[in-house]
Amino acid sequence: MYYTMKETCEMANMTYEALKYYCNVGLIPNVKRDKNNHRVFDENNINWIKSLSCLKNCGMSIKEMQAYLKLCLQGEQTIPERQEMLEEQKYNLIKKLEEIQESLKYIDKKQKFYNQVLNGEVEYHSYLIDTSKKS
């Protein structure tokens, strides 16, 4: 079964512009055309497009995705290189996750402080303005 660009975008949760761009830069191999010369996609294309979305969300650049695709098209013998690329992306994601967790800790701490101030449990202080009471 073949799907239109619009259907493929919906299935892959991707914008029409992004899908068209990925096609134009050669990131989606083996795309067929219908009798009106419109691109049509099969299940294999859609699964690959979903993989591209994941790689993009990992922070992989277009150039890196093109290199990954090239390795994929060479077959099983390139699995070690692909594993290495994915390991690097995983490392980057773990670092990002750690940064996000630190940011969440900061926000939780600030929210707790603000709640304590609003409840009259602690006195408000600021690093930015002078909050000392002048007599």
Where on the chain are the PLM-derived regions?
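C-terminal regulatory/oligomerization modules of transcriptional regulators
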Residues: 76-135
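Basic helix-turn-helix/winged-helix DNA-binding cores
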Residues: 1-70
